[in-house]
UniProtKB/Swiss-Prot annotation:
Lineage start: Eukaryota, Amoebozoa, Evosea, Eumycetozoa, Dictyostelia
Source organism, top-level taxon: Eukaryota
Keyword Iron-sulfur belongs to the record: no
Pathway terms, separated by semicolons: Protein modification; protein ubiquitination
Gene name per UniProt: anapc10
Organism: Dictyostelium discoideum
Family note: Belongs to the APC10 family.
Subcellular location, principal: nucleus
Self-association state and partner proteins as the record states: The APC/C is composed of at least 13 subunits that stay tightly associated throughout the cell cycle: anapc1, anapc2, anapc3, anapc4, anapc5, anapc6, anapc7, anapc8, anapc10, anapc11, cdc20, cdc26 and cdh1.
Protein's recorded name: Anaphase-promoting complex subunit 10
Start and end residues of each DOC domain: 4-187
């Protein structure tokens, strides 16, 4: 478990943190099944994933609040980006977050526990350790407490990034680039 990991934050969808990550990584959250422990009507998973920083997920129960991200198979996960805005959300802003990973809900292990101080923008949580990506079927983000002892939480967006892998890395056949072979690449 890592406490108080290296966290960077910024505030727009076109900000440098997001652009730098998207150059070398791919957003894999779209392949997952998302669920939340509770939500106010009109502030659910759809708002958490709609790429609109004006909408948000709002919990509606006692803490801790959970966001569960389940992939159909084990994935290599590099970064988790969470967007919070203290200026807009005040006591709804999370201040203590736990990230757990595993294959199913019953074998989750805490990998990161971090405390945030008035976060405003994208919070980049690296999930690769010693140059090895986290490999998991399931991620769970737990909000343990909010600023100013708030009860419900607001999170505006979450993005999950994995390695960008080219298909050439998975083919077992060598590349044939000689003129003799290229003559037979197409049919007339």
């Amino acid at each position: 478990m890592i406490k108080n990991s290296n966290i960077n934050s910024n505030s727009r969808l076109d900000d440098p943190i997001l652009q730098e990550i998207e150059l070398n990584k791919v957003e894999i959250g779209k392949h997952a099944s998302w669920s939340v422990s509770s939500a106010k009507p009109g502030s659910g998973v759809e708002q958490l994933r709609d790429n609109n920083l004006d909408t948000f997920w709002q919990s509606d129960a006692q803490q801790p609040h959970h966001i569960t991200i389940q992939f159909p198979k084990k994935c290599y996960i590099e970064n988790l980006l969470i967007h919070c805005d203290y200026k807009l959300d005040e006591s709804y802003t999370p201040c203590k977050i736990s990230i757990k990973a595993g294959t199913i809900l019953h074998d989750l292990q805490e990998i990161i526990l971090t405390e945030l101080e008035e976060p405003s923008g994208w919070i980049n949580i690296p999930l690769s350790f010693n140059n090895n990506s986290l490999k998991a079927n399931l991620l769970q983000i737990s909000i343990l407490s909010n600023l100013k002892n708030g009860r419900d939480s607001h999170i505006r967006q979450i993005k999950v990034y994995g390695k960008k892998i080219s298909i050439e890395n998975y083919t077992q056949y060598p590349k044939f680039n000689s003129p003799e072979v290229s003559m037979f690449q197409t049919l007339r």
